């Protein structure tokens, strides 16, 4: 069984768990999504071999839409996390996100926080404070065009032209900065923005979790 691990000290680690598919395997009940583990690896190549495995803290239990959101978080992290590079802050963000999903908080806020923190940790932070050309603060009454990995620039866009996927209202950017996503239009704009930003690094291959969830994440 080929398994992708997110670790505190080594970033992403891909490893083979020999015999894990067997009914009596010592790994079978442990190698599950959202289960914190204590794991040892061996091998010199890119793909390691799983050694000892012990249960860590209590497993995260997700159901319904929150399960699909957790799957989305796992897949995005797996696709973007560099193997064998320490990302302690990113691991903490991942852990906090799963714990939050286990609760009853607003899923849109939880996911947008995760995505923004992920991009920042990987060096692609989105500046929601100012126009990258003029360095003027984002204005609630203006419209801005977004370029991934660059930022926002003021545009003469009007409400009639809002179908342009890269154009955002200043009021929505400010609301996202404050994680105030109560308005449906703001939550939709925030999701669109993060799809653009993440898409620049995820590539053209569709996310399986997004397909399962009907494209909503």
Tell where the protein language model's regions lie, with residue ranges:
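Non-catalytic alpha-helical scaffolds and adjoining flexible linkers that form interface surfaces
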Residues: 1, 6-217
């Amino acid at each position: 069984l080929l398994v992708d691990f997110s670790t505190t000290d080594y970033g992403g680690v891909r490893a083979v768990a020999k015999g894990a598919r067997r009914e009596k395997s010592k790994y079978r009940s442990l190698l599950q999504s959202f289960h914190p583990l204590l794991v040892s690896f061996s091998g010199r190549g890119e793909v390691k071999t799983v050694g000892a495995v012990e249960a860590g803290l209590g497993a995260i239990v997700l159901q319904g839409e929150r399960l699909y959101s957790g799957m989305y978080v796992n897949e995005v992290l797996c696709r973007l996390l560099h193997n064998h590079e320490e990302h302690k802050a990113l691991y903490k963000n991942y852990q906090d996100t799963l714990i939050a999903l286990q609760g009853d908080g607003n899923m849109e806020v939880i996911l947008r926080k995760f995505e923004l923190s992920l991009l920042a940790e990987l060096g692609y932070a989105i500046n929601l404070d100012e126009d990258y050309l003029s360095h003027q603060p984002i204005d609630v009454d203006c419209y801005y065009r977004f370029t991934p990995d660059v930022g926002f620039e003021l545009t003469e866009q009007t409400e009639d032209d809002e179908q342009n996927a890269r154009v955002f209202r200043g009021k929505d950017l400010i609301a996202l900065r404050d994680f105030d996503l109560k308005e449906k239009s703001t939550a939709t704009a925030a999701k669109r923005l993060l799809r653009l930003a993440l898409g620049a690094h995820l590539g053209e291959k569709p996310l399986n979790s997004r397909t399962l969830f009907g494209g909503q994440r």
